[in-house]
Amino acid sequence: MRSCAPRSSIRLFQGNSLPWGGLMPKGDEVMEVRKLKTVIAGCGKIFPMHAVPVSRDPHAVLTAVCDVKPERAGAAAERFGCRAYTDFEVMLEQEKPDVVHICTPHYLHAPLACLAMERGCHVLTEKPMAIALADARRMLDTAAATGRTLGVIFQNRYNAGSQLIRRCLDNGDLGEVRAARVLLTWDRSPEYYSQSDWKGTWDKEGGGVIIDQAIHTLDLMRWFIGRPVTGVQASLANRTHPDIPVEDTAEGRVEFEGGAYGAFYVMNHYCT
């Protein structure tokens, strides 16, 4: 385990609200509020997208990172001035964090999230929430049983255009949404899948273009329509990636409560 001294300090706030929603005494009374101890599991490509904002957040302190590759964990810890671990459970025991960010391969999201919540931590995990419906339900059940907050990254909801559409829908400016259509054309080379042993697999990634690329756009469709999904019909195909078993093309129809529906065609072998 690599050890570096983490930065930690006390922040003072005035007023009656805390940045994460807690309440303070009204008036000018000042009380001490400690920073949220934060750790990150997984130091791969998406890691900096979590570590950088956490390190800049005045209400949080990054105390540790964890990765199964010691050299990667060590490099991340040195960059952000925190401790490095290769064992997730040991990190939880030693650090006793308030918040855990999960940036691991997909199949690890559910077990790590549940373990962290059972240890009293709030969790923010990268998408997808899980690779199986039963695992996603277990995560929700664990959050409810422990009283911890569970968050899943769907950053496209916060794009300026997405926020504008959501406001227009909430205000009734666009009327009732009865149908939506998704067309997604990405390009993923064979090298994208060969760079790791979990990409392009059913048991570790959980699928192909739907769970990895189209998940964001399909999430926006459901968010804009704003109703529960009642049915899905879809067909999957692999047209240009013979070395992987998962789909690179999918099309289908999503039915929503109240009669609205969405159609989608997605691929990650777009020719440019």
State where each predicted segment sits.
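NAD(P)-dinucleotide binding in Rossmann-like oxidoreductases
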Residues: 27, 37, 241-247, 257-272
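N-terminal Rossmann-like dinucleotide-binding module
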Residues: 25-80
